[in-house]
Amino acid sequence: MKFREDYKLIFPLNPDILIVPECEDIQKINLDLFSNTVTDSYWIGDNKSKGLGIFTFNGFKIKLYQNYNDKYKYILPLIVSNQTETYNLIGCWTKKVEGGLEYVQHLGFSLEDYNSFLNHDKVIICGDLNSNQIWDKSSKYPIIQM
């Protein structure tokens, strides 16, 4: 599935924020085709075919948190705001990383490192956590255990 081909299913819902794991580079997407005007976007990836795309609409803007740690490349702390609201957002696409950490461990350690970012009145954590009960093992990171 390509987001540029499947976006029509989402836009009737009039989203303010979209987190799109496995999203191709935004440069490949004709944003003018969207029925909703994109206010801002952020994309990170290792190749042009797969990355993490964040899109905002309805006046919301995106700013990368100043203490972003690329050790957690696909766990993006972003400040999302419009004229009246501000949210701290963690957009996630947990995937295999060097060092042998499980997906949920990687997420858990990132949330620990971003503790001060998460200490905000309005926090959203969303995306593809790649977590499933059938994969659960005893984690070295207990706050993420199910």
Language-model features: where?
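Short, acidic/polar
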Residues: 2-12
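Short, flexible loop segments at the rims of nucleotide/cofactor-binding pockets, characterized by
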Residues: 1, 65-68, 100-105
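Active-site metal-binding loops of divalent metal-dependent hydrolases
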Residues: 1, 23, 94, 128-129
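Proline-aspartate-enriched helix->loop->beta-strand connector
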Residues: 14-20
